[in-house]
Amino acid sequence: MAESVTMRELLARDGCLTLPGVYDGISARMADTMGFEALYMTGYGAVASSLGVADAGVASYTEMVDRVRVIAGAIRVPLIADGDTGYGGLLNVERTVRGYAAAGAAGIQIEDQEFPKKCGHTEFRRVIPEDDAVAKIRVAVDARPSRDFVIVARTDARYSDGLDAALRRAERFLEAGADILFVESPETPEELRRVAETFRGAALLANMVEGGRTPYLSADELGTMGFKLALYPGTGFLAAAASMRAAYAHLREAGIGTGGPALLPFEEMNALMGFPAVHAFEKKYGVTQVRAA
């Protein structure tokens, strides 16, 4: 990663920052070319694309930090990465924060669900005791390598215990040193406004999941409410899944890939993945390619 600005500097700017969800090398490179100022590694997308299973607590720390390393190494802007519950107790949280930072992330999200955790817009989520959740945030804050590495503190208590409980936890997370507050899945516009009004002046993140539990709003609308970050974690992988399904259906029926849904031209894909730099390297160091006559 060769970021020219830190997440903390981005948070100090005016306006609401749009964060697209990325989950692998291709999505990361694609989003990085589109002019976004920062990216977010979605746990759902990372687990789905690497393991082919649901985001239900099955991914390990090792699997996730490896994905952070891949994505951070492919982009030029800061990356916030989903750290789930920290993959265990307080010592695990410390290891996770340090590992994500060493892998190139500019920030990490830590949440208060019980293990095994689940995607924040699905059913049957439960949270750990409030004091234990606060302790995880304190450990995360102390474990980061510098203040430029931001801690996103997420609570899922709205679903299990109600909005008042979620706001109380978020307040304590802020007191523990969290840089960004993430109250997961408010279920009405009024609840979103209440979150924003309760923490006026704090850096607030709103999670916009297509088809999720929270009213789906634009970054401008969320910024007007008082949110600092508008996260769209599923847009990329939902679009990719729809495109692949259409392309594979056409291939199955027609017996050929072209002539159906739009495909990215091969040369554009090569450019996206860095082949021009590979060719320049080979020319610089005298690498020759042998072609059959």
Model-predicted segments: where are they?
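Alpha/beta enzyme core
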Residues: 2-250, 284-293
